[in-house]
């Protein structure tokens, strides 16, 4: 199986829009190819999502006081045949379902406390890390449970070979802002998801005076940089929460505090994306689709 996640947003004039659904469609094709499933044309994927948002328009909420309520869409494809054994699917089911959702942070944005996972890996090079499939998320659950028992909100995974290179959280991409104005994020090397929110942030970064940099990030470099103030702001990003500030890292028994846990630049990036999605700012890149 493979799946996607995107949202339908109601604007002030009552119109309903999707944010970069073509990017989700392209990633859906990539995921299908990796798992030997039939590929659905991007246009058909987008039309299905637009059609559901139109049919279920009464379920697309007003933004509300938080300014973040929306209809979450879940397109998915599963093997659908009577067969017992190992083999690629000859019959599949593609469907899109939706559910109204509120703000990810009901009582305001709160910084995350991350458990640094140096042993268990979420994915490995040559595996399915770039595909959006359930197995990747299932592989993160044991570490998520461990994180909760340690009082953490989420897990920061490193690579499966050297156990040192930062990859991503259980369901979000990772980014850090350096004091000299670089927006640093792990490079795409086949083990992390090609996040649409990640891509969008990298594209708007220059508008905020930031230099986007995709490269390998050593976990010890990050933690040392957080301690010294070299990385004063750190955050995670994804469709559900958009941008989530990170306040601290728990590495073994050592806690490392972020200098600016809800930093000005992090929150400005978050506001920029939300304003585009909800029509409060001009969409000069043509990201919205109705």
PLM features per residue range, with description:
Residues 1-154, 161-165, 203-290:
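Conserved alpha/beta cores of soluble small-molecule-handling proteins
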Residues 162-190:
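Glycine- and Gly-Pro-enriched alpha-helical subdomains that act as flexible
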Residues 195-200:
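Feature captures the catalytic cores and cofactor-binding loops of soluble hydro-lyases/lyases
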């Amino acid at each position: 199986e493979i799946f996607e996640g995107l949202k339908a947003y109601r604007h002030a004039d009552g119109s309903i829009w999707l944010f970069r659904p073509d990017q989700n469609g392209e990633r859906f094709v990539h995921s299908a190819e990796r798992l030997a499933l039939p590929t659905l044309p991007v246009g058909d994927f987008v039309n299905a999502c637009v059609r559901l948002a139109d049919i279920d328009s009464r379920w697309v909420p007003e933004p509300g006081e938080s300014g973040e309520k929306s209809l979450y869409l879940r397109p998915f494809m599963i093997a659908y045949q009577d067969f017992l054994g190992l083999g690629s699917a000859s019959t599949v089911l593609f469907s899109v379902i939706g559910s109204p959702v509120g703000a990810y942070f009901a009582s305001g944005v709160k910084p995350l406390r991350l458990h640094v996972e140096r042993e268990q890996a979420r994915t490995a090079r040559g595996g399915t890390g770039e595909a959006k499939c359930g197995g990747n998320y299932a592989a993160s659950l044991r570490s998520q449970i461990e994180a909760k028992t340690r009082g953490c909100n989420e897990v920061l995974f490193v690579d499966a070979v050297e156990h040192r290179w930062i990859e991503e959280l259980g369901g979000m991409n990772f980014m850090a802002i350096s004091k000299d104005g670089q927006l640093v994020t792990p490079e795409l090397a086949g083990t992390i998801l090609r996040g649409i929110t990640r891509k969008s942030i990298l594209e708007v970064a220059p508008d905020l005076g930031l230099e986007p940099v995709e490269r390998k990030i050593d976990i010890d470099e990050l933690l040392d940089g957080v301690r010294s103030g070299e990385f004063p702001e750190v955050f995670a990003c994804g469709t559900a929460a958009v941008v989530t500030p990170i306040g601290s890292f728990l590495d073994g028994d050592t806690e490392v505090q972020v200098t600016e846990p809800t930093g000005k630049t992090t929150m400005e990036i978050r506001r920029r994306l939300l304003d585009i999605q909800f029509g409060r700012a001009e969409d000069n890149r043509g990201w919205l689709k109705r």
